[in-house]
Protein backbone atom coordinates (compact mmCIF):
# COMPACT_ATOMS: atom_id res chain seq x y z
CA UNK A 1 0.00 0.00 0.00
CA UNK A 2 1.31 3.44 -0.94
CA UNK A 3 1.15 6.10 1.78
CA UNK A 4 1.22 9.88 1.39
CA UNK A 5 4.58 11.41 2.25
CA UNK A 6 3.68 14.74 3.83
CA UNK A 7 7.22 16.06 4.33
CA UNK A 8 10.79 15.22 3.35
CA UNK A 9 13.78 15.28 5.70
CA UNK A 10 17.15 15.31 3.97
CA UNK A 11 20.29 15.18 6.10
CA UNK A 12 18.24 15.70 9.26
CA UNK A 13 17.83 13.38 12.21
CA UNK A 14 14.84 12.51 14.41
CA UNK A 15 15.60 11.55 18.01
CA UNK A 16 12.73 9.94 19.95
CA UNK A 17 12.94 9.84 23.75
CA UNK A 18 10.78 7.11 25.26
CA UNK A 19 9.40 4.04 23.50
CA UNK A 20 6.58 2.70 25.67
CA UNK A 21 2.86 2.45 24.94
CA UNK A 22 2.77 5.03 22.13
CA UNK A 23 6.26 4.98 20.62
CA UNK A 24 5.92 1.96 18.30
CA UNK A 25 2.75 3.32 16.66
CA UNK A 26 4.27 6.79 16.29
CA UNK A 27 7.40 5.29 14.71
CA UNK A 28 5.40 3.34 12.14
CA UNK A 29 3.45 6.46 11.16
CA UNK A 30 6.67 8.45 10.79
CA UNK A 31 8.15 5.76 8.53
CA UNK A 32 4.95 5.72 6.47
CA UNK A 33 4.36 9.43 6.06
CA UNK A 34 7.74 11.18 6.41
CA UNK A 35 10.31 10.78 3.66
CA UNK A 36 13.32 9.92 5.83
CA UNK A 37 16.02 7.26 5.87
CA UNK A 38 15.45 4.91 8.85
CA UNK A 39 19.15 5.32 9.66
CA UNK A 40 18.38 8.96 10.49
CA UNK A 41 16.06 7.97 13.37
CA UNK A 42 17.33 7.06 16.84
CA UNK A 43 15.39 6.01 19.93
CA UNK A 44 16.57 6.62 23.49
CA UNK A 45 14.77 4.70 26.23
CA UNK A 46 15.48 3.76 29.83
CA UNK A 47 13.84 0.38 29.14
CA UNK A 48 14.60 -2.25 26.51
CA UNK A 49 10.87 -2.81 26.01
CA UNK A 50 9.91 -2.71 22.32
CA UNK A 51 13.58 -2.68 21.29
CA UNK A 52 12.86 -5.47 18.81
CA UNK A 53 10.25 -3.30 17.06
CA UNK A 54 12.79 -0.55 16.52
CA UNK A 55 15.53 -2.89 15.31
CA UNK A 56 13.16 -4.77 12.99
CA UNK A 57 12.61 -1.41 11.27
CA UNK A 58 16.37 -0.70 11.04
CA UNK A 59 16.10 1.97 13.75
CA UNK A 60 18.99 2.50 16.17
CA UNK A 61 17.86 1.81 19.76
CA UNK A 62 19.86 3.21 22.69
CA UNK A 63 19.19 1.91 26.20
CA UNK A 64 20.04 4.91 28.37
CA UNK A 65 18.43 6.74 31.30
CA UNK A 66 18.42 10.52 30.99
CA UNK A 67 18.73 12.55 34.20
CA UNK A 68 19.11 16.23 35.17
CA UNK A 69 22.86 15.64 35.40
CA UNK A 70 23.46 13.94 32.04
CA UNK A 71 20.71 14.90 29.57
CA UNK A 72 22.42 18.00 28.14
CA UNK A 73 25.81 16.41 27.47
CA UNK A 74 24.28 13.20 26.13
CA UNK A 75 21.78 14.82 23.76
CA UNK A 76 24.24 17.48 22.60
CA UNK A 77 26.31 14.68 21.09
CA UNK A 78 23.28 13.30 19.26
CA UNK A 79 21.63 16.46 17.91
CA UNK A 80 22.70 19.04 15.36
CA UNK A 81 21.02 22.13 13.92
CA UNK A 82 17.62 21.51 12.22
CA UNK A 83 17.23 18.04 13.75
CA UNK A 84 13.99 17.09 15.53
CA UNK A 85 13.53 15.88 19.11
CA UNK A 86 10.29 14.03 19.92
CA UNK A 87 9.76 13.56 23.65
CA UNK A 88 7.44 10.62 24.43
CA UNK A 89 8.89 10.01 27.89
CA UNK A 90 7.58 10.46 31.40
CA UNK A 91 9.41 12.39 34.12
CA UNK A 92 11.97 14.06 31.84
CA UNK A 93 11.60 17.83 32.04
CA UNK A 94 9.99 19.29 28.95
CA UNK A 95 11.27 22.76 29.84
CA UNK A 96 14.87 21.58 30.07
CA UNK A 97 14.63 19.70 26.78
CA UNK A 98 13.12 22.72 25.03
CA UNK A 99 15.87 24.99 26.36
CA UNK A 100 18.47 22.63 24.92
CA UNK A 101 16.66 22.41 21.59
CA UNK A 102 16.35 26.18 21.38
CA UNK A 103 20.06 26.58 22.04
CA UNK A 104 20.90 24.06 19.32
CA UNK A 105 18.21 25.20 16.80
CA UNK A 106 16.45 21.83 17.02
CA UNK A 107 12.69 21.44 16.52
CA UNK A 108 10.80 19.96 19.50
CA UNK A 109 7.54 18.04 19.95
CA UNK A 110 5.96 16.29 22.94
CA UNK A 111 2.59 14.90 24.06
CA UNK A 112 2.75 15.98 27.71
CA UNK A 113 4.40 18.72 29.74
CA UNK A 114 6.66 16.63 31.96
CA UNK A 115 8.84 17.47 34.96
CA UNK A 116 11.71 15.59 36.60
CA UNK A 117 10.42 13.12 39.23
CA UNK A 118 9.57 14.49 42.65
CA UNK A 119 12.20 12.18 44.17
CA UNK A 120 14.79 14.35 42.41
CA UNK A 121 13.22 17.80 42.71
CA UNK A 122 11.68 17.37 46.17
CA UNK A 123 8.30 18.68 44.99
CA UNK A 124 5.41 17.35 42.95
CA UNK A 125 4.00 19.87 40.50
CA UNK A 126 0.42 19.68 39.28
CA UNK A 127 -0.92 20.04 35.75
CA UNK A 128 -1.78 23.74 36.01
CA UNK A 129 1.49 24.61 37.74
CA UNK A 130 3.57 22.87 35.07
CA UNK A 131 1.78 24.84 32.37
CA UNK A 132 2.36 28.09 34.25
CA UNK A 133 6.04 27.24 34.61
CA UNK A 134 6.24 26.60 30.87
CA UNK A 135 4.53 29.88 29.99
CA UNK A 136 6.84 31.82 32.29
CA UNK A 137 9.75 30.55 30.22
CA UNK A 138 8.24 31.78 26.95
CA UNK A 139 10.25 35.00 26.85
CA UNK A 140 13.45 32.99 27.28
CA UNK A 141 12.71 30.86 24.23
CA UNK A 142 13.72 31.78 20.71
CA UNK A 143 10.92 32.84 18.39
CA UNK A 144 12.94 31.33 15.54
CA UNK A 145 12.74 27.65 16.56
CA UNK A 146 9.40 25.84 16.90
CA UNK A 147 8.64 23.84 20.04
CA UNK A 148 5.14 22.32 19.99
CA UNK A 149 4.06 21.07 23.40
CA UNK A 150 1.25 18.67 24.32
CA UNK A 151 0.25 17.42 20.88
CA UNK A 152 -0.98 13.85 21.13
CA UNK A 153 -4.69 12.96 21.24
CA UNK A 154 -5.73 14.87 24.35
CA UNK A 155 -4.05 17.19 24.75
CA UNK A 156 -3.50 17.72 21.04
CA UNK A 157 -6.12 16.57 18.55
CA UNK A 158 -8.89 17.47 20.98
CA UNK A 159 -8.21 21.19 20.47
CA UNK A 160 -8.76 20.79 16.73
CA UNK A 161 -11.95 18.82 17.43
CA UNK A 162 -13.09 21.71 19.64
CA UNK A 163 -12.53 24.28 16.90
CA UNK A 164 -14.46 22.21 14.37
CA UNK A 165 -17.25 21.53 16.87
CA UNK A 166 -17.72 25.22 17.69
CA UNK A 167 -17.79 26.06 13.97
CA UNK A 168 -20.39 23.33 13.37
CA UNK A 169 -22.59 24.67 16.16
CA UNK A 170 -22.26 28.22 14.84
CA UNK A 171 -23.18 27.09 11.33
CA UNK A 172 -26.23 25.26 12.66
CA UNK A 173 -27.47 28.60 13.99
CA UNK A 174 -26.27 30.87 11.19
CA UNK A 175 -24.38 29.62 8.18
CA UNK A 176 -21.14 31.63 8.04
CA UNK A 177 -18.26 30.43 5.90
CA UNK A 178 -15.37 32.34 7.48
CA UNK A 179 -12.90 30.66 9.85
CA UNK A 180 -11.59 32.65 12.85
CA UNK A 181 -7.90 33.44 13.14
CA UNK A 182 -7.59 35.02 16.60
CA UNK A 183 -8.64 33.99 20.09
CA UNK A 184 -11.05 36.93 20.25
CA UNK A 185 -12.73 35.76 17.05
CA UNK A 186 -13.08 32.22 18.41
CA UNK A 187 -14.48 33.62 21.67
CA UNK A 188 -16.99 35.77 19.76
CA UNK A 189 -18.34 32.69 18.00
CA UNK A 190 -18.58 30.66 21.21
CA UNK A 191 -20.29 33.48 23.09
CA UNK A 192 -22.70 34.25 20.23
CA UNK A 193 -23.58 30.54 20.11
CA UNK A 194 -24.42 30.62 23.86
CA UNK A 195 -21.83 27.94 24.67
CA UNK A 196 -21.45 27.48 28.43
CA UNK A 197 -19.37 24.29 28.59
CA UNK A 198 -17.03 22.17 26.52
CA UNK A 199 -16.53 18.62 27.80
CA UNK A 200 -13.47 16.70 26.70
CA UNK A 201 -15.47 13.51 26.64
CA UNK A 202 -13.80 10.09 26.41
CA UNK A 203 -15.06 6.56 26.98
CA UNK A 204 -12.80 3.52 26.52
CA UNK A 205 -14.63 0.17 26.26
CA UNK A 206 -11.73 -2.05 25.15
CA UNK A 207 -11.88 -5.45 26.86
CA UNK A 208 -9.08 -8.00 27.21
CA UNK A 209 -9.38 -11.77 26.92
CA UNK A 210 -6.90 -12.01 29.81
CA UNK A 211 -8.37 -11.52 33.25
CA UNK A 212 -6.68 -8.91 35.42
CA UNK A 213 -4.86 -10.45 38.38
CA UNK A 214 -5.46 -9.11 41.87
CA UNK A 215 -2.07 -7.37 42.11
CA UNK A 216 -1.87 -6.35 38.45
CA UNK A 217 -2.21 -2.85 37.01
CA UNK A 218 -3.71 -2.70 33.53
CA UNK A 219 -4.47 0.05 31.01
CA UNK A 220 -4.65 0.79 27.29
CA UNK A 221 -1.97 3.51 27.58
CA UNK A 222 0.64 4.64 30.12
CA UNK A 223 -0.24 3.20 33.52
CA UNK A 224 2.06 5.70 35.23
CA UNK A 225 0.38 8.55 33.39
CA UNK A 226 -3.12 7.40 34.33
CA UNK A 227 -2.24 7.03 38.01
CA UNK A 228 -0.55 10.43 38.10
CA UNK A 229 -3.74 12.06 36.81
CA UNK A 230 -6.08 10.01 39.00
CA UNK A 231 -4.18 10.89 42.20
CA UNK A 232 -3.99 14.64 41.49
CA UNK A 233 -6.50 17.16 42.81
CA UNK A 234 -9.16 18.01 40.24
CA UNK A 235 -8.56 21.28 38.42
CA UNK A 236 -10.22 22.75 35.36
CA UNK A 237 -11.39 25.97 33.67
CA UNK A 238 -14.31 27.52 35.56
CA UNK A 239 -16.82 29.29 33.31
CA UNK A 240 -18.13 32.80 33.91
CA UNK A 241 -21.71 31.49 34.12
CA UNK A 242 -20.93 29.23 37.10
CA UNK A 243 -22.14 29.92 40.63
CA UNK A 244 -19.85 29.80 43.66
CA UNK A 245 -19.19 26.36 45.11
CA UNK A 246 -19.35 25.70 48.87
CA UNK A 247 -16.03 26.54 50.52
CA UNK A 248 -15.48 22.98 51.72
CA UNK A 249 -15.35 21.80 48.09
CA UNK A 250 -12.74 24.28 46.87
CA UNK A 251 -8.99 24.08 47.46
CA UNK A 252 -8.01 26.98 45.22
CA UNK A 253 -9.64 29.51 42.90
CA UNK A 254 -7.72 31.71 40.47
CA UNK A 255 -9.06 34.47 38.26
CA UNK A 256 -6.12 34.78 35.91
CA UNK A 257 -5.77 37.32 33.15
CA UNK A 258 -6.56 34.70 30.51
CA UNK A 259 -8.42 31.94 32.35
CA UNK A 260 -10.55 31.34 35.44
CA UNK A 261 -9.36 28.23 37.27
CA UNK A 262 -10.82 26.16 40.07
CA UNK A 263 -9.15 23.35 42.03
CA UNK A 264 -11.22 21.01 44.18
CA UNK A 265 -10.51 19.40 47.54
CA UNK A 266 -10.79 15.98 45.91
CA UNK A 267 -8.51 13.92 43.73
CA UNK A 268 -9.73 12.82 40.33
CA UNK A 269 -10.51 9.22 41.23
CA UNK A 270 -12.91 10.49 43.89
CA UNK A 271 -14.71 12.92 41.58
CA UNK A 272 -17.31 11.84 39.05
CA UNK A 273 -19.51 13.75 36.62
CA UNK A 274 -21.82 13.07 33.70
CA UNK A 275 -21.00 13.51 30.04
CA UNK A 276 -22.12 12.04 26.70
CA UNK A 277 -20.69 9.94 23.86
CA UNK A 278 -22.51 8.64 20.76
CA UNK A 279 -22.46 4.90 21.54
CA UNK A 280 -23.59 5.08 25.17
CA UNK A 281 -25.35 8.41 25.49
CA UNK A 282 -25.01 9.73 29.03
CA UNK A 283 -22.20 8.15 31.05
CA UNK A 284 -20.42 8.78 34.33
CA UNK A 285 -16.70 9.45 34.19
CA UNK A 286 -13.87 10.72 36.34
CA UNK A 287 -13.12 14.45 36.27
CA UNK A 288 -9.43 14.32 35.36
CA UNK A 289 -6.93 17.20 35.46
CA UNK A 290 -5.67 17.88 31.94
CA UNK A 291 -3.72 20.80 30.51
CA UNK A 292 -6.00 21.25 27.50
CA UNK A 293 -8.86 22.26 29.79
CA UNK A 294 -6.95 25.49 30.41
CA UNK A 295 -5.58 26.12 26.92
CA UNK A 296 -8.94 25.46 25.21
CA UNK A 297 -10.71 27.73 27.71
CA UNK A 298 -8.22 30.51 26.95
CA UNK A 299 -8.89 30.11 23.23
CA UNK A 300 -12.62 30.68 23.73
CA UNK A 301 -12.45 33.37 26.42
CA UNK A 302 -12.32 37.12 26.18
CA UNK A 303 -12.36 40.13 28.49
CA UNK A 304 -13.52 43.61 27.51
CA UNK A 305 -13.39 46.14 30.37
CA UNK A 306 -15.22 44.44 33.23
CA UNK A 307 -17.14 42.08 30.97
CA UNK A 308 -15.73 38.60 30.70
CA UNK A 309 -16.81 35.45 28.87
CA UNK A 310 -15.39 31.98 29.34
CA UNK A 311 -16.98 28.53 29.07
CA UNK A 312 -16.29 25.79 31.58
CA UNK A 313 -13.86 23.26 30.09
CA UNK A 314 -13.07 19.93 31.72
CA UNK A 315 -12.11 16.34 30.91
CA UNK A 316 -14.60 13.56 31.70
CA UNK A 317 -12.92 10.18 31.31
CA UNK A 318 -14.23 6.63 31.55
CA UNK A 319 -11.16 4.35 31.23
CA UNK A 320 -11.51 0.71 30.29
CA UNK A 321 -12.90 -1.44 33.11
CA UNK A 322 -9.56 -3.07 33.92
CA UNK A 323 -8.00 0.38 34.28
CA UNK A 324 -10.77 1.50 36.65
CA UNK A 325 -10.20 -1.56 38.84
CA UNK A 326 -6.45 -0.93 38.68
CA UNK A 327 -6.86 2.71 39.76
CA UNK A 328 -8.99 1.75 42.74
CA UNK A 329 -6.55 -0.95 43.78
CA UNK A 330 -3.62 1.47 43.46
CA UNK A 331 -5.43 4.08 45.56
CA UNK A 332 -6.10 1.46 48.25
CA UNK A 333 -2.35 0.69 48.21
CA UNK A 334 -1.49 4.37 48.62
CA UNK A 335 -0.26 4.63 45.01
CA UNK A 336 2.96 2.75 45.90
CA UNK A 337 4.44 -0.62 44.89
CA UNK A 338 2.98 -0.40 41.38
CA UNK A 339 5.09 -3.27 40.09
CA UNK A 340 3.03 -5.64 37.97
CA UNK A 341 1.92 -3.58 34.97
CA UNK A 342 0.35 -4.76 31.71
CA UNK A 343 -0.62 -2.77 28.63
CA UNK A 344 -3.57 -4.09 26.66
CA UNK A 345 -2.73 -4.87 23.04
CA UNK A 346 -3.16 -8.05 21.03
CA UNK A 347 -5.19 -9.53 23.90
CA UNK A 348 -8.06 -7.04 23.39
CA UNK A 349 -11.22 -8.87 22.29
CA UNK A 350 -13.51 -5.96 21.49
CA UNK A 351 -14.33 -2.34 22.26
CA UNK A 352 -13.48 1.15 21.10
CA UNK A 353 -12.14 4.49 22.26
CA UNK A 354 -14.53 7.40 21.76
CA UNK A 355 -12.80 10.77 22.16
CA UNK A 356 -14.48 14.05 21.37
CA UNK A 357 -15.66 17.48 22.40
CA UNK A 358 -19.18 17.86 23.78
CA UNK A 359 -20.67 21.33 23.29
CA UNK A 360 -23.24 22.38 25.90
CA UNK A 361 -25.29 25.57 25.42
CA UNK A 362 -27.52 27.70 27.57
CA UNK A 363 -31.30 27.75 27.04
CA UNK A 364 -31.41 24.61 24.89
CA UNK A 365 -31.29 20.85 25.51
CA UNK A 366 -29.47 20.36 22.19
CA UNK A 367 -25.90 19.12 22.60
CA UNK A 368 -23.27 18.41 19.96
CA UNK A 369 -20.40 15.91 20.13
CA UNK A 370 -17.57 15.94 17.59
CA UNK A 371 -14.68 13.52 17.54
CA UNK A 372 -13.20 10.09 16.86
CA UNK A 373 -14.85 6.70 17.43
CA UNK A 374 -12.15 4.14 16.78
CA UNK A 375 -12.93 0.43 17.13
CA UNK A 376 -10.19 -2.05 18.06
CA UNK A 377 -10.63 -4.00 14.81
CA UNK A 378 -10.16 -0.90 12.67
CA UNK A 379 -7.26 0.25 14.86
CA UNK A 380 -5.45 -3.04 14.20
CA UNK A 381 -6.08 -2.73 10.48
CA UNK A 382 -4.59 0.77 10.57
CA UNK A 383 -1.57 -0.06 12.74
CA UNK A 384 -1.03 -3.76 13.62
CA UNK A 385 -0.37 -4.77 17.23
CA UNK A 386 -1.85 -1.53 18.60
CA UNK A 387 -5.07 -0.55 20.31
CA UNK A 388 -7.56 2.21 19.57
CA UNK A 389 -6.07 4.55 22.16
CA UNK A 390 -2.48 4.30 20.96
CA UNK A 391 -3.53 4.90 17.34
CA UNK A 392 -5.37 8.11 18.29
CA UNK A 393 -2.36 9.42 20.21
CA UNK A 394 0.12 8.37 17.52
CA UNK A 395 -1.69 10.20 14.73
CA UNK A 396 -1.70 13.29 16.94
CA UNK A 397 2.08 12.98 17.13
CA UNK A 398 2.48 12.55 13.38
CA UNK A 399 0.24 15.51 12.53
CA UNK A 400 2.12 17.66 15.04
CA UNK A 401 5.44 16.53 13.57
CA UNK A 402 4.38 17.45 10.04
CA UNK A 403 3.23 20.87 11.24
CA UNK A 404 6.49 21.76 13.01
CA UNK A 405 8.50 20.71 9.96
CA UNK A 406 6.29 22.90 7.77
CA UNK A 407 6.39 25.74 10.34
CA UNK A 408 9.90 25.70 11.84
CA UNK A 409 10.09 29.30 13.11
CA UNK A 410 7.17 29.77 15.50
CA UNK A 411 8.77 29.59 18.94
CA UNK A 412 6.87 27.90 21.78
CA UNK A 413 3.35 26.92 20.69
CA UNK A 414 0.42 24.94 22.09
CA UNK A 415 -2.13 23.09 19.91
CA UNK A 416 -4.37 26.17 19.88
CA UNK A 417 -1.83 27.99 17.68
CA UNK A 418 -1.64 25.14 15.15
CA UNK A 419 -3.59 25.05 11.86
CA UNK A 420 -6.50 22.77 12.78
CA UNK A 421 -7.51 22.16 9.17
CA UNK A 422 -4.03 20.84 8.33
CA UNK A 423 -3.95 18.60 11.38
CA UNK A 424 -7.39 17.10 10.72
CA UNK A 425 -6.48 16.51 7.07
CA UNK A 426 -3.55 14.35 8.20
CA UNK A 427 -5.30 12.69 11.14
CA UNK A 428 -8.71 11.80 9.72
CA UNK A 429 -7.73 8.55 7.95
CA UNK A 430 -6.68 7.14 11.34
CA UNK A 431 -9.64 8.29 13.46
CA UNK A 432 -12.26 5.67 12.59
CA UNK A 433 -15.82 7.04 12.55
CA UNK A 434 -15.02 10.74 12.57
CA UNK A 435 -17.59 13.50 12.72
CA UNK A 436 -20.37 15.15 14.69
CA UNK A 437 -23.51 13.95 16.46
CA UNK A 438 -26.49 15.93 17.78
CA UNK A 439 -28.48 14.79 20.82
CA UNK A 440 -30.65 16.06 23.70
CA UNK A 441 -29.33 16.58 27.23
CA UNK A 442 -31.77 15.01 29.75
CA UNK A 443 -31.47 17.91 32.17
CA UNK A 444 -34.30 16.68 34.37
CA UNK A 445 -31.98 13.87 35.50
CA UNK A 446 -28.49 15.34 35.18
CA UNK A 447 -27.62 19.00 35.90
CA UNK A 448 -26.20 20.73 32.84
CA UNK A 449 -24.34 23.36 34.87
CA UNK A 450 -21.03 21.88 36.04
CA UNK A 451 -21.19 23.48 39.49
CA UNK A 452 -24.63 21.99 40.15
CA UNK A 453 -23.45 18.56 39.03
CA UNK A 454 -20.37 18.74 41.25
CA UNK A 455 -22.39 19.72 44.30
CA UNK A 456 -24.73 16.79 43.69
CA UNK A 457 -21.76 14.44 43.53
CA UNK A 458 -19.91 15.99 46.50
CA UNK A 459 -22.81 15.48 48.87
CA UNK A 460 -23.74 12.07 47.46
CA UNK A 461 -20.40 10.45 46.68
CA UNK A 462 -21.55 6.93 45.78
CA UNK A 463 -19.24 5.15 43.35
CA UNK A 464 -21.13 5.34 40.05
CA UNK A 465 -18.34 4.62 37.55
CA UNK A 466 -18.39 0.96 36.57
Locate predicted features:
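Rossmann-fold NAD(P)-binding glycine/threonine-rich loop
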Residues: 95-106, 111-145
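C-terminal catalytic/substrate-binding lobe primarily of soluble NAD(P)-dependent oxidoreductases
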Residues: 168-466
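A short, basic/flexible loop-to-alpha-helix module at the beginning of a structural domain
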Residues: 1-11
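Hydrophobic/small residue at the entry helix of a nucleotide-binding pocket
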Residues: 22-25
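NAD(P)-binding Rossmann-fold cofactor-contacting core
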Residues: 35-55
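Conserved Rossmann-fold cofactor-binding substructure of NAD(P)-dependent oxidoreductases
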Residues: 66-79
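Conserved N-terminal Rossmann-fold NAD(P)-binding element of oxidoreductases
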Residues: 15-20
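Rossmann-fold cofactor-recognition segment
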Residues: 56-69
